[in-house]
């Protein structure tokens, strides 16, 4: 067969029953009307396309596809063709057989993050319908296995858009590098009502029981978020009672709980009225609404099930604690008992006290719901219901029941606090770059100003850890940096728990309040102090809410490594699906930075989020990282000892290569190539990603084999760790986290595992760095700060001490044999967001172009494929062809022809062919009906059968 026929028809003119024998057909009478010349992407959720939800972009990035009629990996054919080409012949008892590189093929498929969850329909003729905005493409089921959608956000010439390599944009969102950063803050809990019942004139004055005193306030004054009452409260000049209050955000959910409670009370506490699944669902909703930190969603299924069992247990009238709770009289009420039982069930599920920072929505929601009725939950449980935490949950937390915790961490991106409202917030200052020499290097100096507190390594605790390390090697689960720091400890400070009302209802603030805490090892000083809301909440995250607060794009905040002291927010906002919407003001801000034109080749205020924002951010990160590692090189700088330089800095001869980078794995490989292999060429993106995958997934001799073959000079340096001779031999340790921790589609097995890194302090130390505990993600931040420190030439040449030799052996064993990444990625969420980003970007630029791609196999005289592309008229046919072919990274040589069909809103048909393919558009008459057909011809070539693609996909 040399011809392939594609009918182009309208059901108004000819029924599909007459055309269903054709493998492919295009129906033009079903379309979605354009609005102002653009595709109405708002209609995607109600159309049979792919599953993109009608949510905000922040919610959509965490959305798990609901309707899934099957998934398609757009580049699967590209991958299998490469695997087919690379098969090796082997001899077996059955003769010559061909073996596929299964490891590579599995990686290439798993590495893809553009999976499409399809929403397609099957008609009565067993055809699979793929809906486009201007038509419907019908394919016989036998031919549908390789069809995929291709969405392209059109480029706005005013912004000088360049929408190639949108994979980089997806990578940056995964690694929390396409975000704004804003300081953490605290306010009085919205579920509390604080009522004054006595006042004093000074902190030295004590409150007299039963003799209330009033100076500026009056009895019953409610403490708000501003004004005199707040000032008196925050100054600890007033005693308050803590009552529950229902925040507006969760009023509906609390009403549902109270309805269940009323039925339960009316039915004389019948457990049958308590449906644990329903209760848990409502509490989870409350927990999600009252989230104060923004991070990836938790899979709470197992814990939720345990919580439901505990709810059933506690509402059983035969349960001993149920009996005790109902045996208490006095101020106890049935309304309170309902929430007391919920709180006890949550505590038993957690096996300890539940705080607002609990990561599980159902438990966090249980606490918040109980607060609305009981005020401070654990104080009320002890005081009113005579219930305390079980001894096995820890004596320390039992002591906290005497206190009331009235402050709650708030996320300033989300908070509805009004202008003028008072807050407590963190100020975070990073040490500026400094001038030094190659002889001096850049060491960590633990110094503080006279009025500053200092957070550094506690020498005694460090020595204890060192002894354990020498005895038993590196203990990644128990070695913690926070365990060896002095107080105030920046890794354990939690103002929400450190500030409280004591048993006399006096506000107690921590000793570190309103004082600068300096920590040179984190290159920062921090201070928690009083603040004020300066701007109202906006949808745009680029909005500095606090007076004297801070907000930074990630390109300017690589040194902000202490994650608990700030919040992050994606730089996209508003609806995922929109015809046209405003983009964040952050991109205009970036365009004003001095190095923006050099890193993007763009000028002016109109900036594309990708070609301006994403490219600038990635390149700035790359320059910063390479600049740190270049100075950390173990090589000596003979004759340059007194040469001066500024560190850290982002200048260097490697900037040209950075401008060519397309992927974070290229950056990882380039650092090793440039510094150790003296190679300035970039590796191909696919090669770099596979190298990093192998290093992260293999262990032992297999990992070493990859390093030996890929980075031979680096490998020799790595072997030196087993026999350290000079201090400079330790430098290689701090290169290893770059290879093991950084990727855009991995998950750590446990983000609180600690890896060994060298801290070039007054004395060189091997310290534990938790892989994801400070910044919560799979990128550079957990370790980047420690790469800035490097010894000078004088220090490098020193003979290594015995303890340094221990460092080398321990680090070599750990990094050779440990898998840090390759944990469980939430695949349905992580891998399906490429098209979400494309469609959202289209609303910020010039709209969307859509198409589907169909693959036609050719069997003779050579095996190859022809791509049939059916799309709209937003792109020229030859332009669309070039774009789609460019995505076949591995198997482009097998594409021998292209048919590009465009259908306009008015059903106008255009066809473009190239390669071995020729075409002709004809009229076809069947009985009294008429349609157009595209005759696709390949002179001298023969099409393959339907199952040729099946065989290829099972190579």
Curated annotation (Swiss-Prot):
It is found in: Virion. The keyword Transmembrane helix does not apply. It holds the Pfam family Orbi_VP2. InterPro entries: Capsid_VP2_Orbivir. Signal peptide: none annotated. GO terms for cellular component: viral inner capsid. The keyword Transferase does not apply. Transmembrane segments: none annotated. GO terms for biological process: clathrin-dependent endocytosis of virus by host cell; virion attachment to host cell. Keywords: Capsid protein, Clathrin-mediated endocytosis of virus by host, Host-virus interaction, Inner capsid protein, Viral attachment to host cell, Viral penetration into host cytoplasm, Virion, Virus endocytosis by host, Virus entry into host cell. One of its GO terms (molecular function) is structural molecule activity. The VP2 protein is one of the two proteins (with VP5) which constitute the virus particle outer capsid. It is the major target of the host immunogenic response. Responsible for viral attachment to target host cell, probably by binding to sialic acid. This attachment induces virion internalization predominantly through clathrin-dependent endocytosis. Belongs to the orbivirus VP2 family. This is Outer capsid protein VP2. It comes from Bluetongue virus 17 (isolate USA).
């Amino acid at each position: 067969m040399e011809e392939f026929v594609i009918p182009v028809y309208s059901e108004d003119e000819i029924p599909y029953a007459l055309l269903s024998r054709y493998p492919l057909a295009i129906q033009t009478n079903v379309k979605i009307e354009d609005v102002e010349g653009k595709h109405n992407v708002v209609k995607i959720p109600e159309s049979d396309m792919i599953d993109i939800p009608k949510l905000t972009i922040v919610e959509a990035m965490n959305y798990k596809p609901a309707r899934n009629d099957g998934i398609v990996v757009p580049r699967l054919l590209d991958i299998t063709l490469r695997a087919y080409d690379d098969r090796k012949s082997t001899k077996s008892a059955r003769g010559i057989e061909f073996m596929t590189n299964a490891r590579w093929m599995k990686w290439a498929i798993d590495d893809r993050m553009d999976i499409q969850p399809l929403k397609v329909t099957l008609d009565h003729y067993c055809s699979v319908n793929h809906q486009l905005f201007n038509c419907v493409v019908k394919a016989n089921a036998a031919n549908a296995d390789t069809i995929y959608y291709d969405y392209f956000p059109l480029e706005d010439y005013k912004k000088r858009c360049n929408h190639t390599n949108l994979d980089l944009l997806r990578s940056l969102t995964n690694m929390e590098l396409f975000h704004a950063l804003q300081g953490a803050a605290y306010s009085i809990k919205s579920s509390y009502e604080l009522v004054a019942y006595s006042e004093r004139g000074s902190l030295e004055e004590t409150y007299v029981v039963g003799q209330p005193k009033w100076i500026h306030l009056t009895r019953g004054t409610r403490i708000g978020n501003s004004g005199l009452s707040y000032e008196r409260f925050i100054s600890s000049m007033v005693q308050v009672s803590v009552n529950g209050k229902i925040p507006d955000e969760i009023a509906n959910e609390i009403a549902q709980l109270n309805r269940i409670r009323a039925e339960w009370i009316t039915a004389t506490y019948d457990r049958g009225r308590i449906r644990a699944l329903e209760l848990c669902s409502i509490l989870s909703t409350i927990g999600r609404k009252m989230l104060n930190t923004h991070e990836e969603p938790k899979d709470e299924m197992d814990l939720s099930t345990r919580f439901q069992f505990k709810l059933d247990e506690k509402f059983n009238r035969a349960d001993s604690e149920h009996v005790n709770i109902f045996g208490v009289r006095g101020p106890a009420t049935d309304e309170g008992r309902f929430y007391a039982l919920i709180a006890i069930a949550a505590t038993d599920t957690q096996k300890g006290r539940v705080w607002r920072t609990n990561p599980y929505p159902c438990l966090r929601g249980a606490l918040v719901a109980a607060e609305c009725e009981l005020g401070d939950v654990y104080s009320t449980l002890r005081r009113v219901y005579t219930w305390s935490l079980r001894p096995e949950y820890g004596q320390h937390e039992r002591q906290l029941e005497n206190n009331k915790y009235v402050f709650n961490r708030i996320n300033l991106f989300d908070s509805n606090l009004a202008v003028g409202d008072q807050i407590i917030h963190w100020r975070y200052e990073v040490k500026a770059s400094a001038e030094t020499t190659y002889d001096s290097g850049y060491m960590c100096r633990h110094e503080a100003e006279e009025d500053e507190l200092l957070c550094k390594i506690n020498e005694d605790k460090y020595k204890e850890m060192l002894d354990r390390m020498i005895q038993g090697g590196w203990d990644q689960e128990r070695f913690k940096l926070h365990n060896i720091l002095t107080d105030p400890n920046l890794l354990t400070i939690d103002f929400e728990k450190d500030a409280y009302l004591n048993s006399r209802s006096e506000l107690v603030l921590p000793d570190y309040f309103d004082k600068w805490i300096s920590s040179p090892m984190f290159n920062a000083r921090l201070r928690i102090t009083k603040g004020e809301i300066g701007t109202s909440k906006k949808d745009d995250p680029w909005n500095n809410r606090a007076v004297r607060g801070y907000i930074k794009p990630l390109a300017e905040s690589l040194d902000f490594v202490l994650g608990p002291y700030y919040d992050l927010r994606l730089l996209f906002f508003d609806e995922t699906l929109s015809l046209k919407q405003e983009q964040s003001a952050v991109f205009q801000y970036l365009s004003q930075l001095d190095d923006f034109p050099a890193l993007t080749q763009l000028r002016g205020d109109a900036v594309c989020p990708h070609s301006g924002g994403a490219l600038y951010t990635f390149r700035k990160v790359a320059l910063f990282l390479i600049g740190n590692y270049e100075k950390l090189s173990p090589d000596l700088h003979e004759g340059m000892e007194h040469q001066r330089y500024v560190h850290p800095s982002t200048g260097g001869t490697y900037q040209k290569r950075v401008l060519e980078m397309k992927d974070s794995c290229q950056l990882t490989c380039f650092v090793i190539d440039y510094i150790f292999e003296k190679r300035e060429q970039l590796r191909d993106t696919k090669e770099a990603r596979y190298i990093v995958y192998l290093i992260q997934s293999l262990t032992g001799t297999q990992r070493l084999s990859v390093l030996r073959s890929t980075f031979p000079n680096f490998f020799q340096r790595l072997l030196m760790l087993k026999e350290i001779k000079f201090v400079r031999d330790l430098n290689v340790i701090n290169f290893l986290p770059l290879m093991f921790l950084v990727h855009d589609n991995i998950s750590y097995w446990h983000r609180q595992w600690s890896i060994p890194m060298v801290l070039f302090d007054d004395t060189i130390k091997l310290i534990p760095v938790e892989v994801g505990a400070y910044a919560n993600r799979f990128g550079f931040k957990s370790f980047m700060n420690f790469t800035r420190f490097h010894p000078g030439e004088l220090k490098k040449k020193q003979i290594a001490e015995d303890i340094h030799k221990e460092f080398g052996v321990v680090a070599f064993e750990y990094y050779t044999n440990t898998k840090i990444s390759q944990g469980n990625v939430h695949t349905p969420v992580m891998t399906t967001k490429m098209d979400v980003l494309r469609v959202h970007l289209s609303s910020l630029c010039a709209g969307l172009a859509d198409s589907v791609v169909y693959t036609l196999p050719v069997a003779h005289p050579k095996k190859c494929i022809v791509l049939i592309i059916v799309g709209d008229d937003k792109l020229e046919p030859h332009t669309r062809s070039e774009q789609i072919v460019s995505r076949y990274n591995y198997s482009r040589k097998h594409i021998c022809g292209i048919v590009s069909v465009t259908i306009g809103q008015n059903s106008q048909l255009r066809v473009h062919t190239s390669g071995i393919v020729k075409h002709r558009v004809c009229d076809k008459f069947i009985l009294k009906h008429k349609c157009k057909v595209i005759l696709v011809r390949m002179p001298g070539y023969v099409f393959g059968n339907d199952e040729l693609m099946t065989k290829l996909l099972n190579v």
